[in-house]
């Protein structure tokens, strides 16, 4: 059922790579907005532990599901689970990502196997999820897709980085391109697609010296995930402000 405003009476969100870090905080903030949230992790035990941790903090409405976005079989399986349990998906946050570039590697001497592995998760994983769930969103004439990108994927950064983090930077630049293409394709469907740079956040990936908390890093993804009908689409954001690609 749909409210007159166009919002679903009870929204359902899925956040990839969300048993820890920014993804975990995104799940928490969405659930606190009374949204049913699917917390996903590659390991079911890790996901279940994360849900128990949220429950201890009084955060409910969170369901754990196992997901490996680098596997089409796994993506097909979770699509089936979501359709069976909820019948729809309103919000997709593509948060899962890996950073496996070595610090001394540049574009000219990159290990292409590392590039392939990184693209498989950071780009193709998000693409698989979009392909799987966009039909559900279009059927309900409602969807919000948030691609968690990085400043490392922005052209201005790459022009001054000296070729560092080549696999990761390329994967995030490609994710930005996917964001633009999907937003263009889905205009007029009420499925909004945006990218976001969460900044340098204190997580396992960002390290303890990072300047931002997970709460700060999750704020803009959650804002984009809950945009009203007619909201912006096809843009890149940092702290709720549009930034260049």
Where are these regions (language model features)?
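Canonical Rossmann dinucleotide-binding motif of NAD(H)/NADP(H)-dependent dehydrogenases/reductases
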Residues: 2-38
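Conserved glycine-rich Rossmann-like NAD(P)H-binding loop of the short-chain dehydrogenase/reductase
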Residues: 33-49
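The beta1-alpha1 cofactor-binding region of Rossmann-like NAD(H)/NADP(H)-dependent oxidoreductases
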Residues: 44, 66-77
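A glycine-rich helix->loop->beta "capping" turn
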Residues: 59-60, 81-94, 100, 111
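Hydrophobic positions on the long internal alpha-helix
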Residues: 93, 129-133, 137, 178-179, ...
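Catalytic loop of short-chain dehydrogenase/reductase
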Residues: 98-102, 106-119, 138-187
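C-terminal helical subdomain
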Residues: 173, 188, 195-196, 207-245
């Amino acid at each position: 059922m749909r409210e007159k405003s166009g919002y679903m009476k009870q929204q359902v969100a899925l956040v990839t790579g969300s048993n820890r870090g920014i993804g975990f905080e995104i799940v928490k903030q969405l659930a606190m907005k009374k949204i049913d949230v699917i917390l996903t992790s590659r390991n079911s035990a890790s996901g279940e532990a994360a849900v128990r941790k949220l429950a201890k903090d009084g955060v409910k409405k969170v369901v754990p599901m196992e997901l490996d976005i680098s596997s089409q079989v796994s993506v097909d399986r979770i699509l089936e689970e979501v359709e069976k349990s909820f019948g729809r998906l309103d919000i997709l946050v593509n948060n899962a990502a890996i950073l496996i570039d070595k610090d001394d590697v540049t574009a000219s001497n990159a290990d292409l196997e590392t590039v392939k592995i990184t693209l498989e998760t950071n780009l193709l994983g998000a693409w698989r999820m979009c392909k799987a769930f966009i039909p559900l969103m279009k059927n309900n004439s409602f969807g919000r897709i948030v691609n968690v990108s990085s400043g490392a994927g922005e052209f201005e950064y790459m022009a001054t980085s000296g070729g560092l983090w080549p696999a990761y930077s390329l994967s995030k630049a490609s994710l930005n391109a996917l964001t633009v293409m999907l937003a263009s394709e889905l205009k007029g469907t009420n499925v909004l697609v945006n990218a976001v740079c969460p900044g340098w956040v204190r997580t396992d990936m960002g390290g303890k010296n990072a300047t931002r908390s997970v709460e700060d890093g999750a704020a803009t993804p959650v804002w984009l995930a809950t945009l009203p009908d007619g909201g912006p689409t096809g843009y890149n954001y940092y702290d709720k402000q549009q930034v260049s690609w």
